[in-house]
C-alpha cells in the first residue's frame, strides 16, 4: 500500500473569510465562514495527512451535498499556493488525496470491525467529494 506523505508546504494567498455571529449574551463573535472552514479542512489534509483530518472533513461534508463541497474546494488555488516549484496545483493534489485517502497514521488506529466500518464511511464521503470536484472541473 502506497502512503501519501504530507504536502510540501502551502502559503495562504488571501485573508481568511469571516462572518460575525451574535451570541445570546449580546456579544458578537467573528468566525470563519462555512466555505473557509471547508478550505481549512482541505488544507489540513494536504499539510498533515492524518486520519483525524480526513474524519473531520468527512463529518463536515456530511452536513452538505458533495457538490457544494466540491464547488468550494475547486477554488482552493485562489486561496493557497504550493511553495515547492513544479508541483501540481493544490486543488489537483486534494482531489487525489480525497479519491484515495491514505493517511500517514492509518496503521496507528485500533483494528476492529467498528473502526474499519467508520474508516470506510470516511473514505466513501471523501471519494464522493473527489468525484464531484472532477465533475465541477469539466
Q: Which positions does each model-derived feature cover?
A:
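Compositionally biased terminal segments of proteins
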Residues: 1-138
